[in-house]
Amino acid sequence: MAGAGRGAAVSRVQAGPGSPRRARGRQQVQPLGKQRPAPWPGLRSKEKKKVNCKPKNQDEQEIPFRLREIMRSRQEMKNPISNKKRKKAAQVTFRKTLEKEAKGEEPDIAVPKFKQRKGESDGAYIHRMQQEAQHVLFLSKNQAIRQPEVQAAPKEKSEQKKAKKAFQKRRLDKVRRKKEEKAADRLEQELLRDTVKFGEVVLQPPELTARPQRSVSKDQPGRRSQMLRMLLSPGGVSQPLTASLARQRIVEEERERAVQAYRALKQRQQQLHGERPHLTSRKKPEPQL
């Protein structure tokens, strides 16, 4: 024990503070969690080559990546067929999925293929295999009862023809309805359009005869209904209604009484002014009422 300790001390003194053996020992004492993996020797050189690569030919210059992407996107925008094809393919895939769901056909359960991944420990690999196996067993137990030997009865040709005819009829009805709507719109546009002949002269703007429902009618100057205009217009004077005999007799009596009262008033005025009595006996014309 003492010899071993003395030998270690001698070796420590011989090594010295700056010897490479001591530095190597310190590197070995470092914990494993703080070690950094050394970079690959050719990695940085490749990166430098990628960044600072020179053109192969000085007379030719390659198109930048961004510019190539812009050119490709412009070409796709100019070609509308590609967008239509993508939409059509998506519609077909969606239709097939719906048909499979409607038929109730379930796909076969995929058998997992086990392969240990890079950097995966044995315990993690075994745990992953167990989980996938349990998942496959769960799916197989809960799967619906399948009878592959029983084939579905093919549809009769008459049913297929009926379905085809019904589809064609619906399509034709839809086309006919669209044509009728277009014709109605065209007719409405033609009715709203005024055709002006060549050389036609318009002296005044058109008169609007239709009035809104809640509008208040106001008389415009020059168009007011005047009494004089009504009287002068032919047929404007209203004809008196034919009165009965009793009504005519009452009117005659009232007129005679008014005439007698007027005569008495005039005679009284003459007496007050001292006129001669023979003038009062002169017959005067009756006033016309």
Swiss-Prot record:
Its main location: nucleus. Residues 273-289 have a biased composition (Basic and acidic residues). It is found in: Chromosome. One of its GO terms (cellular component) is chromosome. InterPro entries: CCDC137 (IPR026680). Residues 155-197, 247-273 form a coiled coil. One of its GO terms (molecular function) is RNA binding. Residues 1-64, 149-184, 204-225, 265-289 are annotated as: Disordered. Residues 7-20 have a biased composition (Low complexity). The keyword Phosphoprotein applies. Residues 162-177 have a biased composition (Basic residues). The modification Phosphoserine is found at residues 19, 233. The keyword Coiled coil applies. Keywords: Chromosome, Coiled coil, Phosphoprotein. This is Coiled-coil domain-containing protein 137. It comes from Homo sapiens. The lineage of its organism: Eukaryota, Metazoa, Chordata, Craniata, Vertebrata. The gene is CCDC137.
